[in-house]
From Swiss-Prot:
Molecular chaperone. Has ATPase activity. GO terms for cellular component: cytoplasm. This is Chaperone protein HtpG. Keywords: ATP-binding, Chaperone, Cytoplasm, Nucleotide-binding, Stress response. It is found in: Cytoplasm. GO terms for molecular function: ATP binding; ATP hydrolysis activity; ATP-dependent protein folding chaperone; unfolded protein binding.
Amino acid sequence: MTAAQKETLGFQTEVKQLLNLMIHSLYSNKEIFLRELVSNASDAADKLRFLALSQGDLYQGDADLRVRISADKEANTITISDNGIGMTRDEVISSLGTIAKSGTAEFFKNLTGDQSKDSQLIGQFGVGFYSAFIVADLVTVRTRKAGETTAYEWESQGEGEYTLQEIEKEGRGTDIILHLREEEKEFADEWRLRSIVTKYSDHISTPVQMYKAEVPESEGEDGEKIPAVPGEWESINRATALWTRDKSELSDDEYKEFYKHVSLDWEDPLSWAHNKVEGKTEYTSLLYIPKKAPFDLWNRDRQSGLKLYVQRVFIMDDAEQFMPSYLRFVKGLLDSNDLPLNVSREILQDNKVTQAIRKGCTSRIIKMLERMAKNKADDYQVFWNEFGQVIKEGPAEDAANKEAICKLLRFSSTHTDSATQDVSLEQYVERMNEGQEKIYYVVADTFTAAKNSPHLEIFRKKGIEVLLLSDRVDEWMMSHLTEFADKQLQSITRGDLDLGKLDDEETKKAQEESEKEVAGLVERIKTALGDEVKEVRFTHRLTDSPACVVSDDNDMSSQMQKLMESVGQAAPEAKPVFELNPEHQLVKHLNDEQDEDKFAQWSHVLLDQALLAERGTLKDPTGFVTRLNKLMLELSK
């Protein structure tokens, strides 16, 4: 392909949006472009090293992998070169012309227009190569794939299109030439570049080199000749795998910068754990808990997992086999001495070494969270606000660690009456009333709906704390969380209410008397409502409301039905149990109503009100409005 055959291709729409966003949102942190490009170059070296394990000829006599940075002040350019894996034509187009990653639509949907918030999102998304356009108005990429003879040149001004052509290139790998904007000349200074590499990329295991100019022959103070020192490429980073170094010699800043390298996050992590395990299974783990949840945490196609190394050789990204799904937010890496270098995802799936490492890493994260909850409550609250809903998947997924996970759970509660989820099950148990045998909770669509649930009335009256649950995952979680500290967890919206020792004899007698006053009402309402309800009965869980609906112990709760329907699954129909407050004036008036038509209308209105309070929706809202209007019209006469 000659220069005349240069192709002009258009960027994918999302790339254009991303480039525009970066230039306007990331100008306050421009120097990160070098971190991103050096990180990419190091990854290219890692990938070649892995492939060369089985295809040694890919090295072509050049096995010393490195990244080189040079600056030309006169031309106002920076060049970042690597002798890593390189790219084919198709890989150039897919890597530099499109964003081929899941969650792209979610990313753009989450943008707010607030530059500080958007810059955080861009960091989570991982811009990599495109960060070059923060400082450059023209970027040239020359690349040759290892094992191939054809090379390609990609060039763009970061606007709507790019050019692509075949070129001659001596060695494999990729050269990225940044033609700096006039106002970004400071980055064409070698000392400036060295300081950025030291700041952000000291931990990169691939040597990052810059050219040290020749020192000519000179004379010393006593007239002796000092021989010339030839120019050479010298490493300006440590070029040792950070995780292989002793914890005692690593600073917090080094751990934080390494986190940004492995996670593509731009924020500091919340916490981390660095461990070397010896014995039957030998491995090193460096695990991080992020400060912010990624925007695509709930995307089913999202890739998660740890970077996997075997004997310090990079094997794969996103090795999900080492963490349970409820810890999918954890970032970091594993370096195993026991796995084979030719390990595949299939081999990892049913491997005893994998299972031992997974068990150890899971335990380590749980202990890290336990320490944080105990010693750094504010940090733990930050963590819970971001990742609490994911942790709530734990009791169902991980029976072996269920008790420990339960101690990490946090809830809203009537004790605080705040939407903030900061009450632990241990705190609840410590505050339980004398004679209280169960941990009570209510599940609703929102915190406000839970807080105002009529089912809470008797509990507020008696001063019994109730956990207020309103996350989408809560009903499913509670179906797997039935006991804690030998106390049964009881939904206050299921089954007949039994407060056990918390009910005194005097109260029970008063309740029985109030039921006698409206004897026969239950049967009349059963007849009026027919098969709309499973059962009608009196209750003493209410103090201010006339009626409520509850789920039978053996039926699926209304919240679980909603959850199943929201994910497209058919939920078995479960009719509610309709409960009446015999002490409420409306119920007494209903008992006195002799007109059976009006009686039926009022019965339906009471049921619909109770269903609205419990579920927030009605199957027939028009029928409810019609009945209510009719009754109000009659009352106004």
